Structures are given as C-alpha cells and as structure tokens.
C-alpha cells in the first residue's frame, strides 16, 4: 500500500512537471517598430515633416541574468522557448494598397485639413472632424475614407499575424504612433475626449 501511494505521488509530480503553458503575448515592442515604419512611410512619403526631436529609439533592455535555482530547474525540466523578439507583419497586398491610398490622401487634401486644425487624430487610431465647418463640402468624405482604411488596416495586420484578437492592441499602438509622429500644430483627441494641440 505504501509503495502504491509513493508511486502515485511520484507519477502526479511528474505529470505536473510535464504540464507547460506557453503564453502567446502581444509583442508590444515589435508592434511599435512596425507601426512607426508604416506611419513614417505614410507621412514622410506624402510630404509631412517629422516632428523636431522625434527620435524613436526603443528603450534599452535590462540585462537578463539567471538565478542559480533557475539554472538547476532548467537542467531538470527542459524549458520551452518562444521567439525572443517576435515579428509583426504589416506587409501584405491588402496593407500595401491601404498604405498607398493613405499616402495619396495625406499628399493631397487631408494634410491641409490637419494643418488647419479642422481634423485630428483620435485615441482609437482614427481621424475625427474637430471643426466640421472648416472642412470644404468636396472634402468631407476624406475623413470617412481615411477611417475605413484605418479600420481595415488594423484588422488586416491582426489577421496577417494569425491573431485577430490583437486588433485592439494594434489599434492602440498605431493611435499612439500617429500622435507621436504628428507635426507640431496638429490636433489629437485624448482618451477623455478632449482635443489637444501638439
């Protein structure tokens, strides 16, 4: 009886050790880098100047030291490793087409609407009319077209990376990126709904 109990305990311990959970997490740093490249491509190629002092270097990583107990545990239980710096794919035929349409709009009338303060960026990665009366009638559809492309872009990036559930995080990352890359004088609406001038 004692041997059976000991055997069951040992088998349960081995079974518990064998249970490994691998978390698929949102790669924030890779998403920020990808968003910055996409946004830079749209704004820079359409003639929008980069903000002064806008150095977008990623913060340095802390040194990764291992505790001795972790090294011993790694000897006993093989570790499952995920990619150290996962990649976010933002290039696909769909996103390339969206990028070109966005560049054309920014190279055309949309930049003028931002410069005049008639429109601004929102906290959810879209464009909103700040002063609808300042938007000429023939340009009012630009905001709707831009937002349709932005919604499609965020969904396409999440889908291209095999994680549709990341769409909200991708949207937030891009929303922050649009505001950071915006030139001085452009408006943005923060999470509370208040308009602010950069």
Residue ranges and their predicted role:
Residues 1-8:
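Bacterial N-terminal signal peptides that target proteins for export
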Residues 24-53:
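Post-signal peptide N-terminal segment of mature Sec-exported envelope proteins
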Residues 33, 44, 69-141, 145-149, ...:
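Amphipathic, charged alpha-helical segments and their helix-to-coil junctions
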């Amino acid at each position: 009886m004692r041997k059976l109990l000991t055997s069951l305990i040992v088998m349960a311990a081995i079974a518990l050790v064998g249970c490994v959970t691998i978390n698929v997490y949102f790669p924030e740093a890779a998403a920020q880098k990808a968003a910055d490249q996409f946004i830079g491509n749209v704004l820079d190629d359409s003639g929008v100047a980069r903000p002064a002092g806008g150095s977008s270097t990623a913060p340095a990583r802390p040194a990764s030291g291992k505790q001795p107990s972790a090294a011993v545990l790694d000897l006993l239980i093989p570790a499952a490793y995920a990619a150290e710096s996962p990649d976010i794919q933002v290039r696909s035929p769909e996103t390339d087409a969206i990028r070109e349409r966005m560049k054309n709009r920014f190279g055309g009338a949309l930049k003028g609407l931002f410069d005049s303060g008639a429109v601004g960026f929102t906290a959810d990665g879209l464009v909103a009319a700040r002063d609808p009366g300042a938007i000429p009638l023939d340009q009012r559809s630009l905001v709707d077209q831009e937002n349709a492309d932005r919604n499609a872009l965020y969904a396409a990036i999440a889908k291209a990376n095999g994680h549709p559930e990341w769409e909200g995080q991708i949207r937030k990352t891009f929303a922050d990126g649009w505001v950071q890359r915006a030139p001085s004088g452009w408006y943005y609406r923060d999470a509370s709904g208040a308009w602010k001038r950069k």
